[in-house]
Curated annotation (Swiss-Prot):
Its EC number is 2.3.1.129. Pfam families: Acetyltransf_11, Hexapep. This is Acyl-[acyl-carrier-protein]--UDP-N-acetylglucosamine O-acyltransferase. It comes from Helicobacter pylori (strain G27). The lineage of its organism: Bacteria, Pseudomonadati, Campylobacterota, Epsilonproteobacteria, Campylobacterales. Pathway: Glycolipid biosynthesis; lipid IV(A) biosynthesis; lipid IV(A) from (3R)-3-hydroxytetradecanoyl-[acyl-carrier-protein] and UDP-N-acetyl-alpha-D-glucosamine: step 1/6. PANTHER family: ACYL-[ACYL-CARRIER-PROTEIN]--UDP-N-ACETYLGLUCOSAMINE O-ACYLTRANSFERASE (PTHR43480), ACYL-[ACYL-CARRIER-PROTEIN]--UDP-N-ACETYLGLUCOSAMINE O-ACYLTRANSFERASE, MITOCHONDRIAL-RELATED (PTHR43480:SF1). Signal peptide: none annotated. It catalyses: a (3R)-hydroxyacyl-[ACP] + UDP-N-acetyl-alpha-D-glucosamine = a UDP-3-O-[(3R)-3-hydroxyacyl]-N-acetyl-alpha-D-glucosamine + holo-[ACP]. SUPFAM superfamilies: Trimeric LpxA-like enzymes. InterPro entries: Acetyltransf_C, Acetyltransf_C_sf, Hexapep, Lipid_A_LpxA, Trimer_LpxA-like_sf.
Amino acid sequence: MSKIAKTAIISPKAEINKGVEIGEFCVIGDGVKLDEGVKLHNNVTLQGHTFIGKNTEIFPFAVLGTQPQDLKYKGEYSELIVGEDNLIREFCMINPGTEGGIKKTLIGDKNLLMAYVHVAHDCVIGSHCILANGVTLAGHIEIGDYVNIGGLTAIHQFVRIAKGCMIAGKSALGKDVPPYCTVEGNRAFIRGLNRHRMRQLLESKDIDFIYALYKRLFRPIPSLRESAKLELEEHANNPFVKEICSFILASSRGVAYKSSEYSSEEKQEE
């Protein structure tokens, strides 16, 4: 049975599933759909064609699904889809997609978006991610699974961040980040690999292989793209080579890499 505060303003066109809790002074618009077990604390605003997945909890003064902050937006149909078991903390803002993008903003499962996180139009966020306080995502950003982004970090539109990456706090990131890398700075560049996340997700032999692969990729000569092509030719059946090198070759913004910033010896630090 759902528990809905008397002061909540809910459109009769909204779809509220069983077991939903809606706190005082929430505002829920026409196209909103809340799956089972969703919990809205007081003063949450949900608008537009917004779907919230099972057991997601949204804290006070978060605003989801309102018109994208894009001057090209002319009221066309677009969506915001949030998966299951997410925690969305106070004052977060998440916009739906636009005609100029994929027409939707997508957030996976089991993510934590801390206070004041901003997710702009057409972003795609995977699962098991943590976005710390004040993280700002511009439009069209893609973030893989198991990514951590430190507080007060700003990320340029169209940037891609692959699985298992760590972005240090107060960074300004304008280029793509391949799998399992750690970046830091303004502008942010790769500083090494995310050992902590790799140990959680991978076997020791695979970690060793990835370290050796990045050491080869980040040689001064040939270029990073040429190195990625060579690795794909020589190790075409290896899933890690495919994942990492294909990501590098697909980059349109370039990779956040400077040879002077990357230490291939950090693996020895245990």
